Design a protein with these regions (language model features):
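Bacterial N-terminal signal peptides
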Residues: 14-22
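Short hydrophobic/aromatic-rich beta-strand segments that constitute the beta-sheet cores
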Residues: 49, 69-73, 88-92, 135, ...
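Gly/Pro-enriched, hydrophobic low-complexity segments
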Residues: 119-197
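A charged amphipathic helix-loop-strand protein-protein interaction module that recurs
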Residues: 104-123
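N-terminal leader/targeting segments and the immediate start of mature chains
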Residues: 24-59, 67, 178, 187-197
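Bacterial N-terminal signal peptides that target proteins for export
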Residues: 3-14
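An acidic-aromatic
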Residues: 61-110, 169-171
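Short, solvent-exposed coil/turn segments at beta-strand boundaries
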Residues: 41, 63-69, 83-87, 129-130, ...
């Protein structure tokens, strides 16, 4: 009889462990689904940002469209970066120059993987606490490894910071002042060189 009680006790212990594991797993998956829904609802929104690295601090506004992201740097230099899944443009307003680039060959591709994703199972590296949600992605381009972290406030879910690490270099983009905008047109996200004559 004593042997049977010990056996039942062990079984109950394992059932509790399995229940806790799966409920935590489901809760985590539920939060990731909410983050992905939030990301998909970023269309027609903007946020102010402060970007910093070991050498400088820059300020600006980031705009999220349905298929493109536009980043306007306002201080100390006036720059614009517009990216889509396949291409991007870097515009230096002081020099009145534009450079085009392939986003598939840059870490910008990670932004579209995170912001346009609907499948929580494709976001494997997530850390969840009471106050924060971190999504970590890694991409290798031309033998350089980029580690990108998206940090969200947990309740309510709001994107607060993006950290990009490349070897020993890193920069952080702190986001605040989020706004819903009525409509951002295709023209607003145009990649046509504004200084073409």
């Amino acid at each position: 009889m004593l042997e049977k009680d010990r056996f039942l006790e062990k079984i109950n212990f394992f059932i509790v462990i399995i229940f806790v594991f799966f409920s935590t797993e489901l809760n985590g998956e539920n939060i990731v689904s909410k983050v992905l829904k939030y990301n998909n609802n970023l269309h027609n929104t903007s946020a102010l940002f402060i970007q910093s690295n070991s050498e400088s601090v820059e300020e600006g506004v980031i705009y999220f469209g349905k298929e493109r992201i536009k980043i306007n740097y306002l201080k100390p230099r006036k720059l614009t970066i517009i990216i889509s899944e396949k291409k991007g443009v870097y515009i230096d307003h002081d020099l009145q120059e534009s450079q085009y680039f392939n986003t598939n060959k840059s870490y910008a591709s990670v932004f579209f993987k995170i912001f346009n994703n609907n499948n929580p199972l494709e976001i494997p590296n997530v850390n969840i606490s009471d106050s924060l949600i971190e999504i970590n992605e890694e991409v290798e381009i031309d033998e350089t490894v980029y580690k990108i972290t998206f940090i969200y406030e947990n309740n309510p879910i709001i994107l607060r910071k993006i950290i990009i690490n490349e070897n020993k270099e890193s920069f952080e983009l702190g986001l605040f002042g989020h706004e819903n905008l009525k409509s951002l047109t295709k023209k607003f996200f145009s990649m046509v060189d504004p200084y073409l004559n």
